A protein has these predicted regions:
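Bacterial Sec-dependent N-terminal signal peptides
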Residues: 2-38
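Extracellular beta-rich repeat passengers
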Residues: 27-28, 36-43, 47, 53-60, ...
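Catalytic metal-binding/acid-base residues of hydrolase active sites
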Residues: 72
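Hydrophobic or amphipathic alpha-helical targeting/insertion segments
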Residues: 91-103
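Short alpha-helical basic/polar micro-motif
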Residues: 222
């Protein structure tokens, strides 16, 4: 009997021991640390961790750089000019998730403290004067443009860039949170956040890449901006919240080239906080501003907060759509190359398209500007990727 009792006790102990071991939580991985400098001339993978980026870090052609989910990369403007630059032929793979985004931030938390993420490719561009290539305006002075529509610069998934938009080199070259020069359709841009930069949230210079699930929050210039014949057509779920200071929800231009390959964006929300003033020297606060032959098709839109207001001696004029020059009106509006479809408008003074200058009248052809009471705008899931310091960016 004693032998049986002992055997039973041993078995019971082993059972509970086994349960206890299997139920123990898996310890969190220890974050790696390190410094990121350039140029990066060989493939490099950065494990989950906390890193410091110093200088203009260029990823050379033929090189792939990867960041794991949950990593934080900190920049210090006191070290000088800083940016992460993907040269044509290089690839940047960022594998963030909704709960563990990869965050690029700056120590002082001051807008305009670094140059953000800049990517170059050789997809088609149509630059001023009708040419197919130009030199970047970011201070790097790098040529962009080409014929490789499917250029692949990597994949950016669940990435947040904070406090970018700095002027580089000569003090006149402004950058954005995300800047794409002739980036091609082989590149993935998904679940990206541009937070409190001193210039645009996102800017495209030509190229064929599309972007999905994007948030532009509190950027000083435009939430979304492009030129040089950007041709992305698979864009969806774009959300902008303009607070503190900001120009337009979207600034749309084609470098004065009359073309027929306008971009397409579906599911758009453009919101502007009351009293949010534009940069010095401008008095327009438009949701959509078209100029220099800009065009495209935009659908299922919410526009809120683009109303006229006065601060001090300055009166600001808001509109859902503003056409800034006669050429754009003649070549793009009148030929139905601009379509604003199913837009729900609130707290906005000019609810029909207006002329942003004198000497012409804007009248969209039938069916090219339509309003709706049921438009839903961008559909984005909340989470760590869309939050800063615990506060959601989706208002």
């Amino acid at each position: 009997m004693k032998t049986k009792i002992l055997a039973l006790a041993l078995a019971t102990g082993l059972f509970f021991n086994s349960c206890s071991s299997s139920d123990d939580p898996t310890p969190a991985p220890t974050p790696a640390t390190g410094e990121i400098t350039g140029p990066i001339t060989a493939n490099k993978s950065y494990a989950y961790g906390n890193y410091t980026l110093k200088g203009i870090v260029k990823i050379n052609s033929g090189v792939t750089v990867t960041f794991d989910a949950g990593s934080t990369i900190t920049i210090d403007k006191a070290t000088g000019d800083n940016a992460l630059v993907v040269l044509n032929g290089g690839k940047l793979i960022i594998n963030g998730t909704a709960d563990k985004p990869v965050v690029f931030t700056e120590k002082s938390k001051v807008p305009g403290s670094w140059g953000g993420i800049i990517m170059y490719g050789d997809a088609p561009a149509k630059v001023a004067g009708g040419g197919t290539s130009s030199t970047s305006e970011d201070g790097n002075n790098i040529s962009y443009g080409g014929s490789n529509a499917t250029h692949n610069g990597g994949s950016l998934n669940y990435v947040r860039v904070e406090y970018a938009g700095s002027k580089l080199a000569d003090g006149t070259k402004e950058n954005n949170a995300f800047t794409f020069y002739s980036v091609g359709s082989g590149t993935t841009l998904d679940h990206l956040v541009a937070y409190k930069g001193a210039d645009d949230g996102f800017e495209f210079f030509g190229g064929t890449v599309s972007m999905t699930n994007a948030i532009s929050y509190g950027n000083y210039d435009d939430a979304f901006d492009w030129q040089d014949g950007w041709q992305g057509t698979a864009n969806t779920n774009w959300y902008a919240y303009q607070t503190g200071k900001g120009n337009y929800g979207m600034e749309i231009e084609a470098s004065a080239n009359d073309n027929s390959f306008g971009p397409k964006v579906t599911n758009i929300t453009l919101k502007r906080e009351a009293g949010n003033v534009p940069e010095v020297g401008d008095n327009q606060v438009d949701a959509f501003q078209f100029k220099r032959e800009g065009n495209g098709e935009y659908s299922n839109i919410i526009v809120d907060g683009y109303g006229n207001f006065t601060t001090g001696a300055t009166t600001y004029q808001g509109a859902v759509v503003s056409i800034l020059d006669a050429a754009t009106n003649t070549h793009q509006v009148n030929t139905s190359k601009i379509k604003i479809l199913n837009v729900k408008i609130s707290n906005t003074t000019n609810v029909t398209p207006i002329a942003g200058a004198t000497g012409f009248t804007v009248a969209f052809p039938a069916g090219t500007f339509t309003t709706s009471t049921t438009a839903t705008g961008a559909s984005l899931a909340a989470g760590a990727w869309a939050s800063v310091d615990g506060a959601s960016l989706i208002k």
